[in-house]
Amino acid sequence: MMTLALALGLTATAANADYRVVPLPREIATAKGDAYRLNGETRIVYQGDADMARNATFLAEYIAEKTGMKLTTAVADKKNQRGNIVLRTDAKMKEAEGYRIEVSARGITISGATAQGVFYGIQTLRKSLPVLTQAEEVTLPAVVINDAPRFAYRGMHLDCSRHFFSADFVKQYIDMLALHNMNRFHWHLTEDQGWNIEIKKYPRLTEVGAWRSGTTVGRNSDVDDHVRYGGFYTQEQVRDIVKYAADRYITIIPEIDMPGHMLAALAAYPELGCTGGPYEVGHYWGVYRDILCGGNPKTYQFIKDVLDEICDLFPSEYIHIGGDEAPKMRWEKCPKCQQMISDK
């Protein structure tokens, strides 16, 4: 077992960094001179404000996870920069999310026009380190890395309605986004199969809509497991997750899908549908014909109330409202909808 562990590098006392990470930086230039030797005596020093202090703490945590080394952090001064890892902002750098990493025997410097740019440089350094559990030293070859994102919007999506994920898992997902320099998280929170965010003005959305009495097993299947399933995020949890993401320079874009994909909401408040129900939170995958009633004034009040609370929770510039897969069969036969069409 020890031989295998050593082969994997898990208990090795020394190893080399590898700068060929994902996403690959724009420019990796080998520099002259000796490598830097990262060890337990290394300190992380930072120039700047609370954002840079947080960056330094993140880097210390990342290095501890990868190597077992527990490095201390400190505000940079004239005496403590040489031989250590220095985090700094540089007003001469033009791209707000860009960064520069310089490694030499004298130390490591990560520079960025903003603290956000420095954070992305930290991710590149983090990914360059080998995975060790008891490292005494890591050698980082002399190098100059210059990088900046090609795309302003770099995001991923997570559907937490068809398959519910815990708040802790969502944070782990955000960690993975941060690791890969993502800056947007599209959080899918409502569906036919579940309404998974607390709305205080409409408590039945989570009392009823967050839970389904069974789930179709497999794709294009009529097999139902008849197992109660679901969950939801309290507003307190949402605020915590929003801050967690913001600390990692990730903006969360919540999705409240409408007027389709609203069966869970209709199960909680059947008066919002064209037929008045009864409705049941969706079991199977696909498109349901029951959607919000477009001719009912209560529908528009419901939408306003929900979005008011969502906007209070999420500081994002955008709120995603879906708009897809909304069959019109119910509207075509609904007197209220037809009257609305006629009037408007």
Predicted features by range, described:
Residues 9-15, 210:
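Intrinsic disorder/low-complexity segments in short proteins, especially the signal peptide
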Residues 91-92, 258-260, 324-329:
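Short, internal active-site loops enriched in acidic
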Residues 1-11:
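Bacterial N-terminal signal peptides
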Residues 48-50, 89, 160-162, 189-191, ...:
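A mature extracytoplasmic/lumenal domain signature
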Residues 94-320, 334:
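Feature activates predominantly on carbohydrate-active enzymes
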Residues 66-67, 180, 248, 344:
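Residues at alpha-helix termini
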Residues 326-344:
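Conserved active-site-proximal loop/helix segments of enzymes involved in bacterial cell-wall
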Residues 15-153:
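Contiguous, structured surface segment used for ligand recognition
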